[in-house]
């Protein structure tokens, strides 16, 4: 059966104005951190299993893995990850080429589904597939889908790689060809079709139009997979979701080939917090998931990411002055509720005297505006000309000099955050260092652990807040017999 462009419907000439188009109860998020994400960085086997478990614990119900390609990867590398996911009720989708060899490899894992891809654009067909015709690549994909169907897979995703280029280059003429391809794939047994923006060419307006049109003519659910070459992957994926895509692809921190794809947090938080779209994830678990992933992989959360320490930090004095009264004035209330709890404040030349007043009044019992201003000016002076912000000890001293009150560092950390430190450990020679490494990487505040040689055996990079659950107190509590010496160096 062929689908003519006339069958697509006149309504496709206009953008859909409905903010959420014909949604099922829950939008399905497919996390590809352990497939697409491993194009950015390969993880050790034990890390992959731990990350898989955390993905499941956050509520993700569909996770994508790559079929093994010996000798670079092996069956034994992938099996423990599949088991960790399936034991937690996660649907495992194995990604491979549209060929019988890869389908046979996928069968061995007893995965729930398979994702089969082939390039369809003229550029890719000519230079990657050696000049084969569009009809031939679709027939190859249909053949692979039929093999997957006969193998008993319940989920079969057919990926028309680089399909956005057809839409961009061929416009109206390209859409009927995509419609034809989807119809052939449906008849072959595909359960969902992915229309990826393989080279990150689309903008949100174009992504919205592409998926509005495709959703109208597609007899199969659509998956959205956008690359981030212009920094628009998450925005494009959101637009596709609002126009009817039933599966959206993302990774933690958006990692993937080149500069990645949509970011799981940015995608889920925006859809849930702003558009009211349910994704099935535990929204409030995402910050912990990201911090854990950063610790065990060594991939830092960038400063401009919505879950970074910087995203939580209010810098402008007038902003600080309002935020101490109504914190949602500058940080979205759903982010405070689910991610941060409370804002942090930067000590800079712009520090607010109202912030200082909020900190000291519970301890002084009175409001002395002149002293408050002098404290604020002293803090501002310390950071003038780009100097490093003062330590919490220095802040304590500045306040004490004006008020005679010593405010606990733990209390100051509530406003200014903990301090970034290097913790140098000297261990007893017989103690198994990996035991400490493995446990410390699970602790909140730890950024990384390195074994070293010299005066110390191990260096822990961390943020400490001086409470009972700080990294230093946990080390002394849990490993008293392992430590010969412990030193803390505060950094900026």
Which functions belong to the PLM regions below?
Residues 4-23, 27, 33-35, 277-415:
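A mid-to-C-terminal "edge-of-domain" accessory segment
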Residues 91, 115, 194, 247-250:
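Short hydrophobic alpha-helical runs that function as membrane-insertion/retention elements
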């Amino acid at each position: 059966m062929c689908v003519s462009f006339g069958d697509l419907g006149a309504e496709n000439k206009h953008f859909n104005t409905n903010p959420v188009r014909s949604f099922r109860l829950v939008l399905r998020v497919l996390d590809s951190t352990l497939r697409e994400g491993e194009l950015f960085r390969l993880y050790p086997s034990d890390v992959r299993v731990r990350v898989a478990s955390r993905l499941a614990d956050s509520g993700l119900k569909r996770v994508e893995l790559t079929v093994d390609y010996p000798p670079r990867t092996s069956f034994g590398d992938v099996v423990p990850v599949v088991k960790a996911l399936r034991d937690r009720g996660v649907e495992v989708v194995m990604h491979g080429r549209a060929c019988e060899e890869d389908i046979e490899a996928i069968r061995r894992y007893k995965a729930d589904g398979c994702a089969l891809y082939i390039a369809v654009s003229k550029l890719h067909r000519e230079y990657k597939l050696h000049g084969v015709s569009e009809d031939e690549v679709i027939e190859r994909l249909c053949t692979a889908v039929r093999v997957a169907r006969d193998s008993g897979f319940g989920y079969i995703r057919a990926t028309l790689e680089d399909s956005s280029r057809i839409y961009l280059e061929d416009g109206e003429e390209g859409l009927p060809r995509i419609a034809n391809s989807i119809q052939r794939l449906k008849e072959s047994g595909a359960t969902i079709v992915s229309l990826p923006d393989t080279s990150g060419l689309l903008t949100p307006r174009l992504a919205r139009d592409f998926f509005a049109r495709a959703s109208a003519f597609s007899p199969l659910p659509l998956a959205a997979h956008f690359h981030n070459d212009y920094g628009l992957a998450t925005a494009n994926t959101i637009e596709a979701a609002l126009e009817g895509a039933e599966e959206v692809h993302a990774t933690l921190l958006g990692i993937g080939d080149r500069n990645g794809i949509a970011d799981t947090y940015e995608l889920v938080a925006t859809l849930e917090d702003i558009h009211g779209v349910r994704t099935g994830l535990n929204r409030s678990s995402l910050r912990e998931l990201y911090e854990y992933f950063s610790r065990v992989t060594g991939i830092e959360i960038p400063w401009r990411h919505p879950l970074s320490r910087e995203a939580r930090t209010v810098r402008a004095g007038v902003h600080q002055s309002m935020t101490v009264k109504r914190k949602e004035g500058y940080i979205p209330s759903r982010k405070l509720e689910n991610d941060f709890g409370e804002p942090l404040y930067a000590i800079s030349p712009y520090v607010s005297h109202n912030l200082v007043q909020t900190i000291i009044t519970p301890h002084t019992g009175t409001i002395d505006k002149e002293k408050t201003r002098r404290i604020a000016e002293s803090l501002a002076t310390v950071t003038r000309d780009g100097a490093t912000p003062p330590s919490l000890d220095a802040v304590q001293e500045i306040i004490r000099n004006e008020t005679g009150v010593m405010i606990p560092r733990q209390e100051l950390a509530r406003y200014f955050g903990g301090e970034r430190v290097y913790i140098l450990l000297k261990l007893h020679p017989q103690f198994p260092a990996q035991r400490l490494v493995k446990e410390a990487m699970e602790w909140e505040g730890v950024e990384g652990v390195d074994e070293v040689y010299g005066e110390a055996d191990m260096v822990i990079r961390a943020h400490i807040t001086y409470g009972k659950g700080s990294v230093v107190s946990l080390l002394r509590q849990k490993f008293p017999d392992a430590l010969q010496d412990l030193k803390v160096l505060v950094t900026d």
